[in-house]
Structures are given as structure tokens and as C-alpha cells.
């Protein structure tokens, strides 16, 4: 089996020869580095499981005659796994350092800012957001309750509190009136008066 001739022997250099190849090798995608790191972690877990399997199968020297060949074989496997494990940890550290180096210039963005809002009116006051949403939701529930009337036509059907619709009036209801939306209370007062 012969080796391929080098570029110095008269053949044109390949497309990845020279400074472009070195620059391409240096600029590795961070996502591919993370994938390599994930595979390295999986290899570490696999090697560690094999080490524990070897240790579990070893017998303690309790005065039992131990075959020298078996002992040497298991010891060699254990040392090989430990050596490979230390190499994998070094590789993982290099990948970790390279990922941190690539992401070093990026400012961490809070997770709350990554959530897209459907309706943004341009206001930057974060404290005004949740009460506005709650008041809109309350208004929608009040409109739905205002237009829903049960089969008798005398009381609004409270779909939020299904057990209260079986009662003849709100006087016997166990729900405090403060828990019922204002529009339902007002419509109930109009019906009862």
C-alpha cells in the first residue's frame, strides 16, 4: 500500500491547503462544539459504567486463590478505562473553554425578555402589563356572564361557579359576593329589583 504523493511533488494543492484550512479549523461552530461536548459526556458516562461493572465483578482478596491471568487482564482493562476517562475529561474541558471563548462577547439576555408579546403598545412600564391584562380578562368574563342567562331567564348563569346556578338566589349562595365579578353583581341587582 503506497502513500499518496504530497503537493510538493508537483501536484496542485487541494482546496483546503494553506491559511484558509487553518482558519476554517480554528473557527468551529459553537453548536457543533456543544454537540461534541454532549457526545463526550455520553462517552464519559459509558466508560464510568464500564468501570463500575468491572469493579462489581472483581472479587475481594478474602484468602481465595485468585488467577493471576484474570487479575492482570481486569487490571489492564481498568487502567485503560481510567486513562480513557481522563482523556475524555480533558477533551470536555477544552470544548467547554472554547465554547466560553466563543460566547464571551455575548451579553446574557434575561429569559423574560426572550418571551414575545402579541400586543406591545410601546410602553416600557412593566408594572402596567399584568393589571391591564387582568382588567381585560375581567371585562371579557363580565360580558360573557352578562349575556348568558339560564333556562329560567331570571339569573345570569355563572359558568365560573357551576354549583351556584342550582340555587334559587344568591342569598343562599356560599360564595361571597366579593368573589363574583362586578358586572354579574350589578346584573343580579337589576334582575332582583
Swiss-Prot record:
One of its GO terms (cellular component) is mediator complex. Residues 10-20 have a biased composition (Low complexity). GO terms for biological process: positive regulation of DNA-templated transcription. InterPro entries: Mediator_Med30_met. Component of the Mediator complex, a coactivator involved in the regulated transcription of nearly all RNA polymerase II-dependent genes. Mediator functions as a bridge to convey information from gene-specific regulatory proteins to the basal RNA polymerase II transcription machinery. Mediator is recruited to promoters by direct interactions with regulatory proteins and serves as a scaffold for the assembly of a functional preinitiation complex with RNA polymerase II and the general transcription factors. Transmembrane segments: none annotated. Its main location: nucleus. This is Mediator of RNA polymerase II transcription subunit 30. It comes from Bos taurus. GO terms for molecular function: transcription coregulator activity. Component of the Mediator complex, which is composed of MED1, MED4, MED6, MED7, MED8, MED9, MED10, MED11, MED12, MED13, MED13L, MED14, MED15, MED16, MED17, MED18, MED19, MED20, MED21, MED22, MED23, MED24, MED25, MED26, MED27, MED29, MED30, MED31, CCNC, CDK8 and CDC2L6/CDK11. The MED12, MED13, CCNC and CDK8 subunits form a distinct module termed the CDK8 module. Mediator containing the CDK8 module is less active than Mediator lacking this module in supporting transcriptional activation. The modification N-acetylserine is found at residue 2.
